[in-house]
C-alpha cells in the first residue's frame, strides 16, 4: 500500500475500563447471539469520532489508486427508493436491488455522485476495502467489544448511546427509517452528515443508525457463551464478519438493530448502500 497516509477523521481516546457487553433488555434476535450479557475489560484505545467519510476515503483512493470490491464487481446492493438505475431484486428482500454501476463513487447507481456528500459516511465498502484503508492510514477496525464499549459512551447497560429513551419523530436522535417500511417513508431516506445528532458520552457521533459499521471480528451467534473477558478479539473460525450499529434503513417492524448491543454480519466482500466503517488505534497513553 506504500507510504502511510493521513487519516482525515477526528479521533478521541477512550479510557480503559470494564463494561457489561450484550443485550440487557431482552430485545435482540436470538439468532444474532446478543446474550448472555457478560463482563468485558478493555485497555484504552483511540477511536474515530465519526464513521469514515467520503472525503477521507477519497483521499485514500487518490493516494493509492485503490479499486474497491464493488467497482471490480461492477455491481452493488442499493435500497430501491434511491436507486438511480434498474437492478435485480435480491431474493427474500426485494427492496434491495443488485444495481450495476453502484459503488462508493456512485452510491445510488449510475448518474448519482458524491455532490454535497463529502461529510457523509462512505458506503459500498466491503470488509476487505475497510482493511485496505486501515492499512494505509495506520489504523485498525475495532473489535466488536471495542465498538460496543465506545458506542455506549459510558452508559453501561443502556439500550442506546444516549440512554434508554426510544427515538421518536419528535425527538429522532438517530437516522433510521421513518414511516412504513419499506415503501412509505415519511422523511429522508439515505445517509446524512456524520455529525448529525448529539454525540455520546465519549464524543462519538451516530454509533447507531446512518450506516452499519464493520468490525474486525469473525461472527458467531454462540461466541458470547465462550468469549474471553479481557480484550476479546472474536472467534478464530468463520466466514462472516461482524457489523454493528444499524443503519438508516432500520425500522422496528423489520430491523430493530439500531441498539448498541445489536449484532449483524455479512461476508467480507459484501457491499451495500448502508454499510461503512470507523477505525481504532492505540491510545496516546498506550503509544
PLM region spans:
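Short, structured beta-strand segments at or near domain termini in extracellular proteins/domains
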Residues: 273-286
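Short, P/G- and charge-enriched loop/turn segments at secondary-structure junctions
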Residues: 2, 27-36, 90-92, 263-268
Amino acid at each position: 500500500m506504500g507510504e502511510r497516509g493521513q487519516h482525515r477523521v477526528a479521533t478521541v481516546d477512550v479510557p480503559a475500563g470494564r463494561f457489561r457487553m450484550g443485550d440487557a433488555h431482552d430485545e435482540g434476535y436470538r439468532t444474532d447471539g446478543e446474550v448472555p450479557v457478560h463482563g468485558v475489560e478493555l485497555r484504552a484505545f483511540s477511536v474515530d469520532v465519526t464513521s469514515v467519510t467520503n472525503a477521507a476515503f477519497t483521499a485514500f483512493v487518490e493516494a493509492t489508486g485503490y479499486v474497491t470490491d464493488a467497482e471490480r464487481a461492477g455491481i452493488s446492493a442499493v435500497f430501491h427508493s434511491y436507486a438511480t438505475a434498474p437492478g435485480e431484486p435480491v431474493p427474500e428482500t426485494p427492496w434491495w436491488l443488485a444495481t450495476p454501476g453502484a459503488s462508493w463513487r456512485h452510491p445510488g447507481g449510475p448518474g448519482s455522485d458524491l455532490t454535497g456528500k463529502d461529510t457523509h459516511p462512505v458506503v459500498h465498502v466491503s470488509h476487505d476495502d475497510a482493511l485496505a484503508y486501515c492499512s494505509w492510514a495506520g489504523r485498525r477496525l475495532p473489535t466488536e467489544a471495542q465498538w460496543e464499549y465506545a458506542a455506549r459512551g459510558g452508559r453501561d447497560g443502556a439500550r442506546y448511546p444516549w440512554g434508554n429513551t426510544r427515538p421518536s419523530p419528535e425527538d429522532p436522535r438517530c437516522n433510521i427509517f421513518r414511516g412504513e417500511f419499506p415503501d412509505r417513508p415519511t422523511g429522508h431516506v439515505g445517509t446524512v452528515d456524520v455529525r448529525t445528532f448529539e454525540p455520546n458520552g465519549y464524543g462519538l457521533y451516530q454509533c447507531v443508525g446512518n450506516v452499519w459499521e464493520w468490525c474486525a471480528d469473525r461472527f458467531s451467534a454462540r461466541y458470547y457463551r465462550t468469549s474471553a473477558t479481557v480484550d476479546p478479539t472474536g472467534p478464530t473460525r468463520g466466514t462472516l464478519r461482524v457489523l454493528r450499529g444499524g443503519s438508516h434503513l432500520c425500522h422496528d417492524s423489520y430491523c430493530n438493530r439500531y441498539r448498541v448491543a445489536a449484532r449483524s454480519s455479512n461476508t467480507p466482500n459484501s457491499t451495500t448502500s448502508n454499510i461503512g466503517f470507523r477505525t481504532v488505534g492505540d491510545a496516546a497513553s498506550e503509544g
